[in-house]
Structure formats: C-alpha cells, structure tokens
C-alpha cells in the first residue's frame, strides 16, 4: 500500500475502469485504488463528485494543500475523510471527558512534550553539542509542578516548556547543518530554505497522522496539547509532534548535509521561500523512506515508523477507555 502525491495542475475523475488523473497537458494516468492508502494533492486539482464517491467507498482520504509561488505562501487547506466506519460514541464521550478534565488533559500533554524532548535528544546526541546536555537537564514534570499555581494555566505552562525544548533543538540544529540554517522557526510563509523543507515535511507528516487516526475510533478534532481549531484536525497536530524530530528534522539534516538539495530546488516569492516540484520530490522520496523504515526497539518490535504513528493513536484510545497509561512514542533502541 502506498501514498499518491499529485504535484501537477489537473483533474481527478472517475473513468470507466476506475480513477484517473489528467494533467494540464492532457496526459492521463490511472490511479490503482487497490494499492493506495491516501492521496496528497499539492497543486490546483479539481476533483469530480464521482471520484470522491469512489474514494469514499474505498475509505481513501485526500489531503489538500494550497500554494501561491508568487507570494511564497503554502499551507494545509483541508482533508476529505470518508465517513468513519470505526466511529464509536463511547470513545467520543471519553475523549471529550478527558479534554474537559484538566488533570487528564495535562497528563496526555506532558507525555507528548516529554517524548518530543527525548526524540530531540536522539537526533542530536551523536553530534556532541551543548544543547544535548541542556535538553537532558529538562525534567518536564518537575518544571510543570514548580510552575503551576492555577490549573487554568496548566496547558499554557506545558506549551511554554515545549517551546523551550524546540528552541534548544533549533539552536543545536543550526550547529550541525552545513549550508541552510533555520535561524529561527518561521511558518506561513517559511522565510528561508531550511524552514520551507521543515514546513513541507511537517504537512506530509500531519496528513499521514490524520490518515492513521482515521483508522481508530478517535475524533481527530479533539486534542489535548493544541487548542481546538475550526480549520484543522488538531489531534493530528498532537500526535505528530513527537515524530517531527525523528522524521521531519532527520530529513532536513540528510538532504542538506549530503548536498542533495540545492538552491535550484527553491522558489523565492514576495513573502517567503517555497520548494519547486523537483525539491518537493526530493523531500517526498526521503519522507516515504523514513515512514517505511523498520525499527527494532527494546521491546523487540520491528515495525515501520508509520505503524508506530498508528500504534500511538491506539495507545491514546486505550488510555481513554480503560485508563491504561498513555505512552507517547520514544525512539528507544
């Protein structure tokens, strides 16, 4: 099973023998529905009603992204999610209750943030830089307890701890990146080459996480670390966060330090920097490789990174249903 990425302008429609994509040059390509997990549409593509119905019948999500190269703007637009056949009223009730219960919500959010910290260390530790020592000193739970005076401030305190972790991580990254530097994290639009690689890879990771959540009974609109948003499935933001260091930022380090990605792979707009089609293909290739990479952990499991994304979602579901401790994914060999 694979992911389809559509990078060209065109039309997605249902033909006599299945689903097809036709580009602006009238070149027609069949899309084999029996072998795909999801579709990412990364350009201006019209999708017919019959195509959507066919995808809905096969439970195949589509993720849409908007881009304006002149302005240098690119962002997630929305997703088409077929009716969730695994929907559970009980899980929905439990998820809402956990969101409203500040102590439970805090427990989930702290676990995610500590997993972010741990995975940031795993990415940086072989470079022997000071930021690794600083990240190891951070005790997420202790910092939270020492800062908490009122439970209504709990989530903002956790986000502050998370922000400190990411800032240390970014400082460390800039020491090891050979060419393009983050300098500081910028979004919508990303202001430089490193940031645009990160933003693009993060949108892919968000889409994959949403696809995997869709396979569970969880409601993707109800989150714990991120605030609920009308424009995004915020649980996918929560559950992708601790995978960013080991997927997104390893992609950045590899493409930059191996000299794979170059100035010719970027487009500079009025407000920011974007990847051109060839640049996107390089990121997608490395992203797929990271997702399919099998990792054997201390538990003895040898599974793909995509599998661990789904397993984390199921882990959260079990916590909501029967109170088994929620464990966010950590890269523990």
Swiss-Prot record:
Its EC number is 3.1.-.-. Gene3D superfamilies: CRISPR-associated endonuclease Cas1, C-terminal domain, CRISPR-associated endonuclease Cas1, N-terminal domain. This is CRISPR-associated endonuclease Cas1. It comes from the Archaea. PANTHER family: CRISPR-ASSOCIATED ENDONUCLEASE CAS1 (PTHR43219:SF2). Keywords: Antiviral defense, DNA-binding, Endonuclease, Hydrolase, Magnesium, Manganese, Metal-binding, Nuclease. It is an enzyme of class 3 (hydrolase). Homodimer, forms a heterotetramer with a Cas2 homodimer. Its cofactor is Mg(2+); Mn(2+). It comes from Nanoarchaeum equitans (strain Kin4-M). One of its GO terms (molecular function) is DNA endonuclease activity. Belongs to the CRISPR-associated endonuclease Cas1 family. Mn(2+) binds at residues 162, 226, 241. GO terms for biological process: defense response to virus; maintenance of CRISPR repeat elements. CRISPR (clustered regularly interspaced short palindromic repeat), is an adaptive immune system that provides protection against mobile genetic elements (viruses, transposable elements and conjugative plasmids). CRISPR clusters contain spacers, sequences complementary to antecedent mobile elements, and target invading nucleic acids. CRISPR clusters are transcribed and processed into CRISPR RNA (crRNA). Acts as a dsDNA endonuclease. Involved in the integration of spacer DNA into the CRISPR cassette.
């Amino acid at each position: 099973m694979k992911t389809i990425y559509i990078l060209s302008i065109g039309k997605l429609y249902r033909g006599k023998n299945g689903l097809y994509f036709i580009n602006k040059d009238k070149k027609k390509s069949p899309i084999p529905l029996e072998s795909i997990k999801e579709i990412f549409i990364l350009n201006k593509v019209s999708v017919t009603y019959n195509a959507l119905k066919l995808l809905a019948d096969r439970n195949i999500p589509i993720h849409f992204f908007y881009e304006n190269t002149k302005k240098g703007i690119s962002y997630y637009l929305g997703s088409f999610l077929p009716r969730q056949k695994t929907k559970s009223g009980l899980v929905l009730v439990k998820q809402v209750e956990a969101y409203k219960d500040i102590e439970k919500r805090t427990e989930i959010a702290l676990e995610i943030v500590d997993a972010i910290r741990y995975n940031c260390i795993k990415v940086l530790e072989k470079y022997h830089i000071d930021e690794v020592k600083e990240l190891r000193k951070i005790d997420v739970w202790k910092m939270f307890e020492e800062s908490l005076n009122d439970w209504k401030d709990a989530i903002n305190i956790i986000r502050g701890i998370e922000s400190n972790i990411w800032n240390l991580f970014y400082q460390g990254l800039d020491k090891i990146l050979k060419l393009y530097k983050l300098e500081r994290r910028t979004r919508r639009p990303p202001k430089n080459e490193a940031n645009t690689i990160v933003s693009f890879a993060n949108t892919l990771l968000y889409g994959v996480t949403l696809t995997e959540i869709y396979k569970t009974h969880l409601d993707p609109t109800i989150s714990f670390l991120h605030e609920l948003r009308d424009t995004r499935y915020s649980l996918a933001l929560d559950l992708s966060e601790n995978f960013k260091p080991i997927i997104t930022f390893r992609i950045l380090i590899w493409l930059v330090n191996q000299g794979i990605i170059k100035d010719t792979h970027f487009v500079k707009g009025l407000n920011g920097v974007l990847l051109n089609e060839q640049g996107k293909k390089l990121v997608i290739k490395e992203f797929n490789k990271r997702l399919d990479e099998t990792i054997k952990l201390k538990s003895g499991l040898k599974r793909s990174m995509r599998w661990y994304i789904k397993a984390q979602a199921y882990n959260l579901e079990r916590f909501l249903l029967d109170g088994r401790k929620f464990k966010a994914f950590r890269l523990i060999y």
